Each structure stands twice: as C-alpha cells, then as structure tokens.
Amino acid sequence: MSEFLPFSRPAMGVEELAAVKEVLESGWITTGPKNQALEQAFCQLTGNQHAIAVSSATAGMHITLMALEIGKGDEVITPSLTWVSTLNMISLLGATPVMVDVDRDTLMVTPEAIESAITPRTKAIIPVHYAGAPADIDAIRAIGERYGIAVIEDAAHAVGTYYKGRHIGAKGTAIFSFHAIKNITCAEGGLIVTDNENLARQLRMLKFHGLGVDAYDRQTWGRAPQAEVLTPGYKYNLTDINAAIALTQLAKLEHLNTHRREIAQQYQQALAALPFQPLSLPAWPHVHAWHLFIIRVDEQRCGISRDALMEALKERGIGTGLHFRAAHTQKYYRERFPTLSLPNTEWNSERICSLPLFPDMTTADADRVITALQQLAGQ
C-alpha cells in the first residue's frame, strides 16, 4: 500500500532549522528582535501601519474583542461556517454571537446577510476570508462605516490573498494565523494588523500582562525595569523561536502559494468531469491563496455521501479535512440557539470535504487523489 497522504503537512526545510538555531544561540529566545522583524514584514506585505504578533489567531481575536470593549449585552455578527474559536471568544466575553448565512457556492458571508442582522446592540462584524479567497470586504467595511460598527477581518486563511489588487489587511483590522496547516506556519502563532494606532497600543498591552512595554522593549530602549500594569492582560506574546520560523516561511510565501495554486488547478481540471462540486470563486478581482481545496459531496448527485467518501479515501491512504462543521450545530451553540436556521450553511456543512493540499505535494500525489475520486464517483 502507498504511504499515507495526509490532508496537510507543513513545508519545513534547512532554512527553518537554521533560523531556529540562530535564535537558540542568540540568548534571546522569547519575544524579541525576530518578533519585531516579523511585524515589520507584515506591515510591508499588507501595507498596513501596525502589526502585533501573538501566540495564536485565537489569542488575537480575544484581545481585539477586549480592546473594542465588547462584552455583556453586545452582539457580534459572524458566519456560523467558521472555526469555533471566534464564537467561543465572543461568548466568553459575555457577548452574543449573531450567526448569519453564507453564499451557497462561495461560502462567503454576504454584505446583505450582515446588514439584515444589524441591531442597536451590534458592536462588531467579523467576516471570514474563506479557504484562501477574499470576502467582499469593501462592501462589508462600507456597512460598518455606515452604522458605526467595527469590522474585524478573520484572515486566518488569507496569507497571500489579494482583493482588488490589495493584500488582505491593507486597511482596517485583520487577524492572520500561523497554525500548522496554514499557508505559512510556525507551529502556533498569529498576527494582527491595524491602521488604528490606539487599538494597536491596547493590543500590545493586552497581549503581555497589561504592561506598557515587554522585556525586549525594556532592554532595547533602556526603559524602567519595573514595568507598570496599565490594564489587566494576558500572556499571548509570540516567542522569537516561532517568529523566526514564521519569517523564514514568509520569505517563501510566493513559492509556497504558487505550488498550492498548481495543485488546485490540477484538481479543478479533473473535477470538471466528476460529480463532486468545488467551491465557486468570488466574482470580484482577487488572488486566491488556496489555503484549502474544498469539494461538496451531495449523495444524490455523487452516489456516495460525504462521510462515506472520506472513509473510503482514508482506506485508500488519503487524508481529508472538514472545514467546517457549522458552529450552530455544535452542542453548546445548538442548545443556546435551538431555532437558528441557516440553509446554505447547513447544506454545505453536511457535504464539504477538504482534499489534500500542501506545498510539498507532488502532481503524482494529486493524481492519486483524482484517481480515487474517479473510482468512488457514483458508488
């Protein structure tokens, strides 16, 4: 039997090993110069003014919501078809997640769905740039500006994604992820970009115990060794070990995403003759980062259910993913919002399947997946 082909695998090489070795030998392994370099690199990538590296995108979402003073009595609009961490952070702060439906074929939250969900209690909107494609962020941001509501872009899938010629996060506030399956990774990590100087200042405090400066600031700039707590905060800083890996990966981003795109194109060409439905691409000008390649497996159309397909692929040594089970169908949120109905979200959540897609995949790997899909179509 062939070696198991995972759904995802990080592309690590000698450059990442050398970057870690350099940090370990430097004597400064926690938040330090590599963090600063990573933040500067993301400002350059996105064109935004401020970047704040954090221990995860979830941590970034937590402190961004906190900095916006979102809490009990507030509502935050976001799709249900997203990773549950966003809903969890909203709920843990005492606010109410208002989950809205997505477009049936792009799986993007729409401006119309967002605007129809706004109430006097709405405090923030969190659109998701899904699977590596961009949401219609100009239209969504215009709604936020019209109603005076903050927009926080969930850009966890969007390192290397462009919308109308601009990298995601070029303006406003966006949160990126460096988790192990993302387009660039440092195992765990995240980063917030923003053009709001006051928000950036608050985020830096909240990510490091509520202190006005961190240890590297104090050493570098000679500030008082007894840093003062300005507000209660968290331990969400990123180590320089992680930052060094992320920097090395960022330097490879174009190469990594180009290979993802080539594998995605190979899938697209083959699927044209198969009943499995890939996602539609957004109509607006964009560059897709191809974080995920998702098909919809409708049993009536394909002759096999999604779950049966995933199991059959596993038996053939091929891994798959599910991105995502709709959050409002999870036990906690199902019991909290028992009457919530999101038809497009639910239809897709029962049928979506993420195929293997990662930079070290070969065309032969993709052919193996395609051959298996051809064999299973109609079963």
UniProtKB/Swiss-Prot annotation:
Cofactor: pyridoxal 5'-phosphate
Pathway(s): Nucleotide-sugar biosynthesis; UDP-4-deoxy-4-formamido-beta-L-arabinose biosynthesis; UDP-4-deoxy-4-formamido-beta-L-arabinose from UDP-alpha-D-glucuronate: step 2/3; Bacterial outer membrane biogenesis; lipopolysaccharide biosynthesis
Enzyme Commission number: 2.6.1.87
Record field: catalytic activity: UDP-4-amino-4-deoxy-beta-L-arabinose + 2-oxoglutarate = UDP-beta-L-threo-pentopyranos-4-ulose + L-glutamate
Molecular functions (GO terms): pyridoxal phosphate binding; UDP-4-amino-4-deoxy-L-arabinose aminotransferase
Highest taxon, organism lineage: Bacteria
Gene Ontology cellular-component terms listed: membrane
S-S pairs: none
Complex and partners: Homodimer.
Protein name as annotated: UDP-4-amino-4-deoxy-L-arabinose--oxoglutarate aminotransferase
Organism: Shigella sonnei (strain Ss046)
Biological classification of the source: Bacteria, Pseudomonadati, Pseudomonadota, Gammaproteobacteria, Enterobacterales
Gene: arnB
